[in-house]
Amino acid sequence: MAKVEIEQQQTDGLREKMIGVNRVTKVVKGGRIMSFAALSVVGDGDGGVGMGKGKAREVPVAVQKAMDEARRSMIKVSLNNGTLYHAVTGVHGAAKVFIQPASEGTGIIAGGAMRAIFEVMGVTNVLAKCIGSTNPYNVVRATLNGLKSMNTPAEIAAKRGKSVEEIRG
């Protein structure tokens, strides 16, 4: 996969990052048909993040399709002063990611596709490790699955019928 780092600020206030562009080939009776597949993430810098894939005969069209799909598929993740509330694990296929909060000044310690997600969603301090498959598509999905599973202390307290102070100890 070609590593393409394109970051754009759109007028709607969303941060966009291209994770990669692949050239794919379909072999038919008359020869080969070349097209391009793009993977991108979009975030609002405040915990919102979405992932999109686009496929077209030309790179700019594939990139635009990926960005549009990412905008439509955004999810909201609660952040705790630029980091996460607790450690989470996400799995998609053979890709497994481990994500944990980090103290102020640590920065984003994560590889490739995960780093792009954290940058666009506004996370400034996080530790992340990818175990198993490092296929960008699966790593992005595993990361989003892990982030979806994260709960705030208020949500946990509400489920248990306790106060937030009791949960935090």
UniProtKB/Swiss-Prot annotation:
GO CC aspect terms: small ribosomal subunit
GO biological process: translation
GO terms assigned for molecular function: rRNA binding; structural constituent of ribosome
Cross-referenced Pfam families: Ribosomal_S5, Ribosomal_S5_C
S5 DRBM domain span: 14-77
Keyword annotations of the record: Ribonucleoprotein, Ribosomal protein, RNA-binding, rRNA-binding
PANTHER family named in the record: MITOCHONDRIAL RIBOSOMAL PROTEIN S5
Domain remark in the UniProt entry: The N-terminal domain interacts with the head of the 30S subunit; the C-terminal domain interacts with the body and contacts protein S4. The interaction surface between S4 and S5 is involved in control of translational fidelity.
Family designation: Belongs to the universal ribosomal protein uS5 family.
Subunit structure: Part of the 30S ribosomal subunit. Contacts proteins S4 and S8.
Role of this protein: With S4 and S12 plays an important role in translational accuracy.
Record-given protein name: Small ribosomal subunit protein uS5
Gene for this chain: rpsE
